[in-house]
């Protein structure tokens, strides 16, 4: 059984809320990738209660990223649920200090697995 911290961002208001999910709801997320969408109802959420404002019931949640249990960020260009060291010049997991700087960094792949601790999602309105 997996346990995830789910950070849900509302792009209209700019508010983000963090909730913890376990059990069957968390297992529905395993195997999904960054960029995939899932119905909020499928996870058993009432987003109007969580955010305290009126949010329609037919919204989807789009996975935008996350981190694993050791804090390594997920990258959309690394496929699979694995952790790898890659040479990167920009993007998630690296902020260059100089122009043209590249470094070898450890990152996590784009697929959700039980080793993921936090999943970032945003609300996609119909």
Swiss-Prot record:
InterPro entries: Ribosomal_eS6 (IPR001377), Ribosomal_eS6_arc (IPR020924), Ribosomal_eS6_CS (IPR018282). The keyword Transport does not apply. GO terms for cellular component: ribonucleoprotein complex; ribosome. One of its GO terms (biological process) is translation. Keywords: Ribonucleoprotein, Ribosomal protein. One of its GO terms (molecular function) is structural constituent of ribosome. The keyword Metal-binding does not apply. Belongs to the eukaryotic ribosomal protein eS6 family. This is Small ribosomal subunit protein eS6. It comes from Thermococcus sibiricus (strain DSM 12597 / MM 739).
């Amino acid at each position: 059984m997996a346990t995830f911290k789910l950070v849900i961002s509302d792009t209209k208001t700019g508010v983000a809320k963090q909730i913890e999910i376990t059990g069957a709801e968390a297992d529905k997320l395993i195997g999904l990738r960054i960029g995939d969408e899932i119905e909020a109802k499928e996870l058993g959420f009432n987003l109007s209660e969580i955010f305290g404002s009126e949010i329609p019931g037919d919204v989807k949640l789009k996975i935008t990223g996350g981190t694993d249990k050791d804090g390594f960020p997920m990258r959309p260009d690394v496929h699979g649920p694995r952790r790898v060291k890659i040479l990167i010049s920009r993007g998630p997991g690296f902020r260059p200090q100089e122009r043209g700087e590249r470094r070898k960094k450890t990152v996590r792949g784009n697929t959700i697995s039980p080793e993921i601790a936090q999943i970032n999602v945003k609300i996609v309105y119909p």
